[in-house]
């Protein structure tokens, strides 16, 4: 188990090895909900879900961090960025570091984000997305490519896989709070450094980049936290915290 999970968690340690595999450069600011979690370096992604709150993966937890919004080229100041520190970082109470179940956390910002054409929130789901729905995953994670400019936000279109295909890919490891997306033949996937980032389907945040076996490997699609199952906790926490 640890060897499987360790592959994705490398992104939180080796910040230079960051990007999406088999994707393309996102249209600039088309993913205006995408944020970078920073602790002196980019270590995970996240999604702005209101002017005060960001959703990310629980395995990306740090007690204090800085959220960078409005980014495209992560190493260049383009004049669109907002840098806001966290006031609270809250993991799902049933998150398990053993099997990465309920891999979601909320970050409350010390001040509201300014919403504009470069920074805006993504909607939370009111229902789960159907199998085969095409979604966009984005991030500054490992491209495993010498051609792709991974300092610029990368995007990838992926279909949601059936629970059966997901469970067959990872026997005994998939819970009701997880889903798989991608291609069983491999070649396209999220990777190290993308953890915590968004999976957006028809304008709705359906997934959080969580774990997988390697990156873009055959019969091992990416595994994502299933936001539609976890959104009750997200909404309750934002309302009551």
From Swiss-Prot:
Keyword GTP-binding on entry: no
Primary location class: secreted
Catalytic-site annotation from UniProt: 59, 103, 195
Signal peptide: 1-13
InterPro entries attached to this UniProt entry: Peptidase_S1_PA, Peptidase_S1_PA_chymotrypsin, Peptidase_S1A, Serine_Proteases_S1, Trypsin_dom, TRYPSIN_HIS, TRYPSIN_SER
Domain of life of the source: Eukaryota
Annotated Gene Ontology cellular component terms: extracellular space
One GO BP: proteolysis
Keyword line: Digestion, Disulfide bond, Hydrolase, Protease, Secreted, Serine protease, Signal, Zymogen
Pfam name, any one: Trypsin
Subcellular location: Secreted, Extracellular space
Propiece residues: 14-19
Disulfide bonds: 26-155, 44-60, 128-228, 135-201, 166-180, 191-215
EC annotation from Swiss-Prot or TrEMBL: 3.4.21.4
Similarity annotation: Belongs to the peptidase S1 family.
Protein's UniProt name: Trypsin-1
Organism in which the protein naturally occurs: Gadus morhua
């Amino acid at each position: 188990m640890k060897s499987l999970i360790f592959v994705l968690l490398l992104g939180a340690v080796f910040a230079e090895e960051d990007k999406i595999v088999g994707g393309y450069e996102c249209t600039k600011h088309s993913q205006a909900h995408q944020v970078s979690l920073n602790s002196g370096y980019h270590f995970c992604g996240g999604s702005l879900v209101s002017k005060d709150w960001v959703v990310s993966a629980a395995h990306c937890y740090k007690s204090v961090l800085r959220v960078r919004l409005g980014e495209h080229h992560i190493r260049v100041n383009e004049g669109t960025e907002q840098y806001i520190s966290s006031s609270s970082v809250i993991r799902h109470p049933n998150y398990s570091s053993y099997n990465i179940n309920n891999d979601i956390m909320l970050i409350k910002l010390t001040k509201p984000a300014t919403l504009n054409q470069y920074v805006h929130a993504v909607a939370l789901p009111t229902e789960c997305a159907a199998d085969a729905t095409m979604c966009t995953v984005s991030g500054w994670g490992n491209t495993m490519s010498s051609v792709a400019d991974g300092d610029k936000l990368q995007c990838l279109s992926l279909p949601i896989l059936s629970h059966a295909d997901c469970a067959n890919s990872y026997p005994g490891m998939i819970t009701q709070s997880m889903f798989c997306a991608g291609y069983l033949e491999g070649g396209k996937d999220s990777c190290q450094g993308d953890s915590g980032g968004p999976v957006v389907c028809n304008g709705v945040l359906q997934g959080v980049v969580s774990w997988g076996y390697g990156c873009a490997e055959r019969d091992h699609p990416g595994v994502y936290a299933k936001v539609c199952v976890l959104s009750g906790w997200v909404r309750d926490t934002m309302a009551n915290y």
